[in-house]
């Protein structure tokens, strides 16, 4: 893992995983240790089965498999999933998070929505299908810790600058391994780009 900086811009190069990328700061000691530990402990995504108890439809399985291949084989960090209303996007994301957690590719997940009702829906989906992930609704449970955090964009903007009593940021730039953006259209990206750049 290589960090390089000119004092104004910071770049991270995980030389075994992906191309260099600009980051908003340095990882904490714990975040770095996890990044290095994953080099030897993560499983091949193709060797881990999609949980059929979470997603039952063939196209959900195909979407998760394609995203896994995109991350693993193509060494990409971003993916776009487009599904019709009622097609099971939230459950697909829950199953993807489950797969990445079981393969040791992800420890913590951030799920961002534009409305509180969608936050509640996503938290309930994680509680139902992945209860061991300890889903946290950041809109109502702001002081809790878990593996899955669900928030509105507006709430997360405030949480980025939140500090713990010991003076460290609550959410460092390397805190989340998977960030899910629900309803990722241009107006959301333009308005809340700071969140996406930070993580």
Model-derived features: where do they sit?
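ATP-dependent helicase/translocase motor core
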Residues: 1-108, 113, 117-133, 144-148, ...
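Short alpha-helical segments and helix-capping/turn motifs at coil-helix boundaries
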Residues: 133-137, 141, 187-193
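Activation segment
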Residues: 157-160, 188
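SF2 helicase catalytic motif II
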Residues: 167-199
